[in-house]
Amino acid sequence: VTFVDGFGRAVQVKKDGVVTSASKGNSAKDENVMIVSGRNMYDAFGRVAKAFYPTTEGTGSKSTFNKSFDNVSPTVTVYDVLDRATSVTLPDNSTTTTAYTVDNSSHTLVTTVTDALHNVQATHTNGSGKTLKTIQKSGPDGEITTSFEYDGIQRLVRVTDTEGNVTTSTYDMGDRRTEVNHPASGITSFTYDALGNVLTKQTANLAKEGKFITYDYDYQRLTGINYP
């Protein structure tokens, strides 16, 4: 059973369920209940401001809206004027904050997330929403930077880690990744059928022996993986 408000938003869902309880010295007991989804409270702009945990009720009132709230504090979300979440506070009062800035030198949007343990990660994205760089700013070894490069049609072709190690990817005309060159594991290659299903995979070690991992399908459903 789903209840919606005047804007068509689902505000409560009820489902049949079973709760099993047991106490010391007694056997487990099953009870048929209705599981009531946690209620959402919206702000003036229709955004979920508070999300409550689910609760339960008896089976005889499935068609009646349950106005009660769970005793656990709700998850509280704060937004900026662009509807982006800037703060999420969980029931245990731990808070994750998100700041949005612009890096004028690279013309990228920088999204900086700070979790409840004060771990900080900054993500740089371009106008297409592609991630160009991530920086973990609070690791024990200082900043850890990973950079991403794309070709003219926005396919990921190059990843550079904080040590300068480079992983490259090659694609065919169907935008299917045919080769990954990793500095540690070497070259891994893939072949595909006309429908885009992976037919073979060959790692650097298998290539030395001229062997492949092959894949079987039944109407595009994977049915088997064959190792040499």
Enumerate the language-model features and the residues they cover.
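Beta-strand elements of repeat-based all-beta scaffolds
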Residues: 1-228
